Design a protein with these regions (language model features):
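Long, terminal "pre-/pro-" and other extracytoplasmic accessory regions
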Residues: 25, 143-152, 201
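Short amphipathic beta-strand and strand-loop transition segments with alternating hydrophobic
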Residues: 66-69, 148-154, 208-209
């Protein structure tokens, strides 16, 4: 009888390990397909309205321009330029995303007339007072996470994979992200962010998807809600343009002060 129990425990252990490997394999497969479907966009530009809501519902808005260049050997390059209001006009944020480790990020502050490097230890902090962290602004490279497929689930009438993304970088402000990805177009619709104590921190919802150049899906609205503070930030995108001729020289930290 004792031998039978030992055999049963061993068999159950093999089944558990097998299910974990299957979950991780399917999670990586889904995340890889998400990545593949967005390859080849080249570069993009867009305009954006960022609206910040405090816990009482009071709001302030900012007008922003965005530029992104698709990466080859490393991750994407992105540039964010603030146009209004006057107190942030001319502020520019530059990110060179890395496929492993922390990203290279710089912030130009016109009031100080200097470019400030964002230390890797500070990339979990809030971006320009919003509910988005600096690490949220960078492109989400495939190599930055390990993955676990959790289940299939309906989300607003769409059949979705639910996948856990676990950051490899220990300096990330998140212990994990739970992502809802539709099974037809492989678009992200919702992300739950958990803090380092495994508590739900924020939820990001993507709305109003449109397709460009017959292939590239972009959501026009990002809503990030902070469950621990009651604050919220909404990003509304407009005027998407693809393959505009941007190059790496347009994403140089030395020229941040001259960005127009």
């Amino acid at each position: 009888m004792k031998s039978f129990r030992i055999i049963l425990i061993v068999l159950l252990s093999y089944l558990f390990v097998g299910s974990v490997y299957a979950s991780e394999g399917k999670g990586l497969e889904i995340a890889t397909e998400v990545d593949i479907r967005d390859r080849g966009f080249g570069d993009t530009t867009s305009t954006m309205t960022m609206t910040l809501f405090d816990q009482y519902g009071n709001s302030t808005s900012r007008k922003i321009r965005n530029r992104t260049l698709e990466g080859t050997d490393e991750g994407d390059l992105s540039l964010v330029i603030f146009d209004t209001p006057a107190d942030v006009k001319g502020t520019a944020f530059l990110s060179h995303t890395k496929k492993s480790g922390s990203d290279d990020q710089w912030l130009y502050l016109p009031a100080l007339k200097r470019v400030k490097r964002i230390a890797s230890s500070n990339q979990a902090g809030p971006f320009m007072g919003s509910e988005f962290a600096y690490e949220d602004i960078s492109s989400q490279e495939l190599e930055k996470y390990t993955y676990k497929y959790l289940r299939n689930e309906d989300y607003q009438g769409l059949d979705c994979f639910v996948v856990e993304y676990d950051p490899i970088d220990r300096k990330s402000g998140y212990s994990k992200q739970i992502v809802w990805i539709d099974t037809k177009e492989y678009r992200s619709h919702k992300i739950e962010f958990y803090d380092r104590k495994e508590s739900l921190l924020k939820t990001l919802v993507y709305k109003n998807y449109s397709i460009y150049n017959g292939k590239f899906w972009r959501a026009d609205i990002f809503e990030m809600e902070n469950h621990q503070t009651g604050k919220k930030t909404i990003l509304e995108f407009d005027d998407w343009k693809f393959q505009t001729g941007l190059s790496a020289k347009d994403f140089n930290k030395k020229s941040l002060k001259k960005v127009r």
